[in-house]
Amino acid sequence: MIVKNEEKNIRKALTWGKNIVCEQIVVDTGSTDRTVEIAEEMGAKVFHFEWIDDFSAAKNFAIEQASGNWIAFLDADEYFSEEDTKKILPLLAQLEEERRKLKIPLIVRSSLANLDDEGNATSVATQARLFSNVKNLRYDGSIHETLMIGGIKAPRAYEARNLLTVYHTGYTQKVYKETHKLERNIDILKKTVEKNPENYEAWAYLGDSLLANKQMKEAEKAYNLVVKHMNNDLFQERRDFVFCNLLKIKYYSNVNDENELMEIYEKSVEFACLAPDAEYWVGCWMLDRGKLQRGIEYMELALHRLELYDRDGNMDMAGSLSNVYGRLFEAYRSLGQAQEAVKNGTLYLRMEPYGEAVLMEMIRLFKGGAKGKEIASAILSFLSKLYDLSRAKDKLFLIRISRKLMFNELENLVYNLLTKEEKDFFNTNELNILGQ
């Protein structure tokens, strides 16, 4: 990893893989805190590299210090979970055999979840953080660097998106404020485009950094310049990201002119945009304005595209899937399409089991105008597929929902599932549990 002033992260960064790596390489680019001291204390090999506003140069220097057959190149604010770490060596053993047969470098693409200040995933991307250690596989690009083979994007990748996830904490507002990372990136990219105004990839990355820094107007200008000069020289992922972020800007700018929004979307179709976020933002815009059927169509298309998408790049939609299912539930319910509403409501509750509003509407849909123990039993049978009825928390939650709905029969059925100790606890704390 390359680091600068990462004393808050370096210990965790060097801990996750301690038991599976043969060496840990830390390249410091000018820390003034305890980063180097902590890294050396933890047994890492520490090297120093003079910062020259070029992430690829620093990363390639780090690669040159590595002696293993495979490299895990994570930033100091990234880590694999303990569970996923255990999967890495068996996977690499399998891939090493394949690599020797093919005699070409291999990279492993895993999911990357960007976490907010509360630890929730805000977006999900696919990134290459594991790759074979061979001479011609190196990073390219002064910022937002990409693995290349002899100047050409690495073509061979093993898809491990469903197997491995890197968690990234570096995009939180707290980190931005503490590190001034965005200002640094914006400064580097502005210098790049000043030096070469026709470097539209750099303009696209500048738009990303400006947008992350909440400079939406400036970001929009940068993206529009890229669209004006759009061609096949840009990687597919970059083209996708430009269009998706332009649509995102229109959405958050609360643009009311549908033509203005759809002009961008149609342009994205013209350039064969594959990313599901394009349809996602159009779908959100439509649903916000009560255009339910069209909103549903775009959201469903976004979900279909998400299943097929195998490119790099962040996806806001992937970090907001529960929101997608929740919005589809409400739209289908409003249109009286109960079957589709139940399907999406169920998917939402699998992700957000304690989402009261959706659960209450689901129960109302099932109940209709029916009364009595029979309908309550049928609903409880359905709920047992979503909730653990041996778990006190789930039972007490369902009792609270039943009380809010004044569904006495369902409340009684769930109450009777409580153990004696749970009933005693409920009877003592009823007002607090029910939120009354």
Task: Give the location of each predicted region.
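Short, well-formed alpha-helical segments that are part of the catalytic scaffolds
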Residues: 1-23
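Acidic helix N-cap motif at the loop->helix transition within catalytic regions
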Residues: 8-12, 33-42
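A conserved acidic beta->alpha catalytic loop
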Residues: 16, 28-38, 51
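Short beta-strand/loop segment that forms part of the nucleotide-sugar
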Residues: 22-31, 47-48, 75-76
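Conserved donor nucleotide-binding strand/loop of the catalytic core
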Residues: 37-57, 61, 65
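Catalytic-site signature of metal-activated, phosphate-bearing donor transferases
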Residues: 57-63, 81-218
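Short aromatic/hydrophobic "clamp" motif used to bind/position activated sugar donors
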Residues: 71
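Alpha-helical repeat scaffolds
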Residues: 220-228, 256-269, 294-304, 338-349, ...
